Amino acid sequence: MQRTGKAVICRELNQPVVVETIVIDGPKRGEVTLRIAACGVCHSDLSATNGTIPLPPPLVLGHEAAGEVIEAGEGVSSLAVGDHVVTNFIYMCGKCRFCSAGRPVLCIEQGKALTTPPEGTPRTHDAAGKPLNIFSGCGVMAEYATLSTDNLVKIDPKIPLDRAALVGCAVTTGVGAVFNTARVEPGSIVAVFGCGGVGLNVIQGARIAGAERILALATRESKLEM
């Protein structure tokens, strides 16, 4: 079924974003509709509004969010109504040679889900019925969103959704840099330049990895206090 709700939209590059009422279509095969509980604000959202990330407006912003499944489309078996999920803003088909090799971040089908669901038909429209693009296949700076299950990860319902939202980008980017890029080992000395949302999660990741010493550098004293 269709639903209406508020969303944050970039209508024009280098102009203030606007909050509008939008219409969200119900899920098709392999999709679910979410009630969004919380959405982080990432620097990538800013980059989409100024053209640094070249995605065409009108664009519903937001790619790191958490919410509850309220409707499931045909063929969905991995999620059910009532499940809590976080978004995954990098689409993966699960079938190409990179996905099959355990490197889904390099999925050759990513381009299918940059501004629409991977099937290619917009699920999000403005009040006049005109289609809206969605940022990185998500567009979750909104009250509702219909997404492919490939863009979602089920989580424990005990996890507060306002905290879980950050796992969609800030946490995975920071912790992933520690374990997958730098490959920090126990006893390492780690320097972290910048203590924003990602930097703080690099620090946490380094701690989990067993770093002997973590050096945090920031331009604002308030961030170091955290």
Question: Which ranges hold each PLM region?
Answer:
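Residues located in well-ordered beta-strands
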Residues: 6-8, 18, 23, 35, ...
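Mid-domain Rossmann-like dinucleotide-binding core that forms the NAD(H)/NADP(H) cofactor-binding site
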Residues: 144, 150-152, 156-226
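Cysteine-cluster motifs in flexible loop/terminal segments that predominantly coordinate metals
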Residues: 89-150
